[in-house]
């Protein structure tokens, strides 16, 4: 698959932080091949056969950070296949280390631009997409880099099954408002909310993450939005 130029479709920042220690590098190099999705091959039919264990539903998490949420959900729901996208090398290493330690086998990963994976996925193949605490790109000149856009909502709509869910969490008010407006203007999604508690209460079974704890310490509350494909 052709690699996109970062000038046009780069929704992530840096790809590498501190140099990995030798053992961390060994973990990454030994485990990544077994978990990595190869986009040069056509998607398998059915897509659930990506996983070495039987799964009945499929869920995508874009930008899984340290992997706390993804691992928690994978262990909580062994019959769901989880696809995680994260271009940041250090975060990928942490996720794979946790997968190795816990024995979670219902996980597959992609380590580049999420739009490439979305374009590779078959129509109506996913039950849920999670975009949790994405980079808010706070400067106005960078807003075009925010992952929530009409183009990406079109991508979400194509790959989600009818009635599939798009879940978005953020502690940045401007990005929450941005997402509400983008989804309102998109004809393919309904916001599932009857009252404030619906978007101020964490998702069922939600594990707090380090990023969320940091936001709390700094006095920021979070919003948890859920949209259904129509």
UniProtKB/Swiss-Prot annotation:
Q: List ligand-binding residues for S-adenosyl-L-methionine.
A: 61, 86, 113, 135
UniProt-annotated catalytic positions: 135
Keyword match Methyltransferase: yes
Top enzyme class: transferase
Q: Which UniProt keywords apply?
A: Methyltransferase, S-adenosyl-L-methionine, Transferase, tRNA processing
Q: Which GO terms describe its cellular component?
A: tRNA methyltransferase complex
Q: Does the keyword Transferase apply?
A: yes
UniProt cross-references to PROSITE patterns, sorted A to Z: SAM_MT_TRMB
Q: Which reaction does it catalyse?
A: guanosine(46) in tRNA + S-adenosyl-L-methionine = N(7)-methylguanosine(46) in tRNA + S-adenosyl-L-homocysteine
Q: Note the InterPro entries from the entry.
A: SAM-dependent_MTases_sf (IPR029063), tRNA_(Gua-N-7)_MeTrfase_Trmb (IPR003358), tRNA_methyltr_TrmB_bact (IPR055361)
Question: What EC number(s) would the UniProt record show?
Answer: 2.1.1.33
Q: Which residues bind substrate?
A: 139, 171, 209-212
Name-wise, this protein is tRNA (guanine-N(7)-)-methyltransferase
Name the species this protein comes from.
Rhizobium etli (strain ATCC 51251 / DSM 11541 / JCM 21823 / NBRC 15573 / CFN 42)
Q: What gene codes for this chain?
A: trmB
